């Protein structure tokens, strides 16, 4: 460690120039500051640098090899939070279980409570404090449950979907949740998240293809919701459709996936500007591909990276910074308990995050606050 002792300063009419820089505790006294939608890479970040993420309205500081979010919460969106909630399963032993984990810190899931009835291959969305599960249950295929994300315990009945729906997908802007399905000509229904009650008809997914056979990938920002994955007859298609969440109407064409993917639940995760989609089955093969789109800009998806292994039946959610995919079914290793993650604004392959309580697939996932 260097020590500076100053007795006298002469020629103080100009600033002292430290040619090798001046650091305190390894951090430059004068830090760089960047405003951008993407994580800055040049100049190479050093300890103490600040980055204002204009896409998510989050302030970061570079510490210990990475940018860390500053403030009470890293969540900048009204529809998610730092606590992931994963519910249901295709296994009767745990098809009512809700489990949770902290998205900001890698680790394993713990028990949260139980759904009101068995469920699989439904979908979830919320408003940052409440998460609603649109269930596909053996006993009922149009029911919805809800939980308060910060309070461990069992789910309560919310109401019913406007139709009996199989293999749903849900989007949210923080006040309204819209749920769609391949059934009833691609019917969609919506609810106000902070109340309880039955869903109201929203419109239909506008496609001649079957939508989301065994689950669709959905994403959203504060205005738009996207639905991806379909079948054209018995073959995989690559369609993405979108809606304006506050405007009840049929969907419109958004673009296409980078590869055809259709059934057995590939899943999306979103922040305020970007939706990432991973897993699924296409042309008879399990996929490990991750695609991404800018949610507010129509066009085709771009390759993001790969999941840790090719999977179907995955579920996913995010905290507006980190996307997590949970469980899934591998064609040779069967159901998995793995949780894997990516940083939504940084393209690349997924990494291991932790484990679910048990191996499972065809679950539902959402997120909300932890306090």
Regions found by a protein language model. Name each.
Residues 56, 81, 94-97, 109, ...:
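A detector of repeated loop/turn-to-beta-strand junctions in beta-rich toroidal repeat architectures
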Residues 21-54, 68-74:
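Extracellular/surface-exposed low-complexity repeats and stalk/linker segments enriched in Gly/Pro
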Residues 109-114, 154-160, 197-206, 250-258, ...:
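A short beta-strand motif characteristic of beta-propeller blades
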Residues 1, 6, 13, 19, ...:
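Surface-exposed or flexible loop/turn and strand-edge residues in extracellular/cell-surface modules
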Residues 65, 102-106, 148-152, 192-196, ...:
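Short loop/turn segments that connect beta-strands within beta-propeller blades
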Residues 75-88, 115-137, 161-181, 205-229, ...:
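Conserved short beta-strand element of beta-propeller blades
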Residues 4, 9-37, 84, 131, ...:
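Low-complexity, small-hydrophobic/phenylalanine-enriched stretches
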Residues 57-65:
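Short beta-strand segments and strand-loop junctions that repeat across beta-rich extracellular domains
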């Amino acid at each position: 460690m260097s020590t500076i002792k100053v007795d006298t300063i002469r020629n103080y009419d100009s600033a002292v120039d430290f040619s090798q820089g001046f650091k305190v505790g390894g951090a430059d006294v004068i830090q760089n500051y960047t405003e951008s939608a993407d994580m800055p890479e040049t100049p190479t970040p050093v300890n103490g640098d600040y980055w204002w993420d204009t896409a998510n309205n989050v302030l970061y500081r570079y510490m210990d090899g990475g940018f860390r979010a500053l403030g009470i919460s890293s969540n900048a969106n009204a529809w998610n939070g730092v606590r992931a909630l994963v519910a249901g399963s295709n296994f009767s032993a745990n098809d009512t279980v809700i489990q949770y984990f902290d998205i900001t810190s890698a680790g394993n899931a713990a028990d949260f409570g139980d759904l009101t009835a068995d469920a699989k291959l439904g979908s979830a969305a919320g408003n940052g404090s409440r998460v609603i599960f649109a269930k596909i249950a053996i006993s009922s295929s149009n029911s919805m449950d809800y939980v308060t994300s910060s309070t461990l315990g069992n789910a309560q009945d919310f109401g019913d979907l406007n139709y009996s729906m199989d293999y749903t997908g849900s989007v949210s802007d923080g006040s309204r949740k819209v749920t769609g399905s391949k059934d009833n000509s691609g019917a969609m229904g919506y609810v106000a998240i902070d109340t309880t009650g039955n869903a109201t008809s929203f419109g239909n997914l506008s496609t001649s293809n079957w939508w989301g056979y065994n689950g669709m990938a959905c994403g959203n920002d504060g205005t738009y919701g996207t639905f991806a994955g379909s079948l054209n007859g018995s073959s995989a298609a690559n369609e993405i459709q979108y809606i304006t969440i506050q405007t009840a109407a049929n969907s419109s064409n958004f673009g296409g996936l980078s590869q055809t993917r259709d059934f057995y639940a590939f899943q999306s995760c979103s922040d305020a500007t970007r939706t990432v989609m991973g897993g699924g089955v296409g042309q008879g093969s399990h996929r490990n591909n991750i695609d991404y789109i800018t949610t507010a800009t129509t066009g085709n998806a771009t390759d993001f990276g790969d999941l840790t292994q090719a999977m179907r039946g995955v579920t996913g959610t995010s905290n507006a910074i980190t996307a997590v995919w949970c469980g899934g079914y591998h064609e040779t290793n069967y159901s998995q308990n793995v949780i894997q993650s990516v940083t939504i604004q940084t393209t690349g392959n997924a990494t291991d995050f932790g484990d679910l309580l048990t191996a499972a697939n065809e679950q539902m996932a959402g997120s909300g606050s932890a306090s």
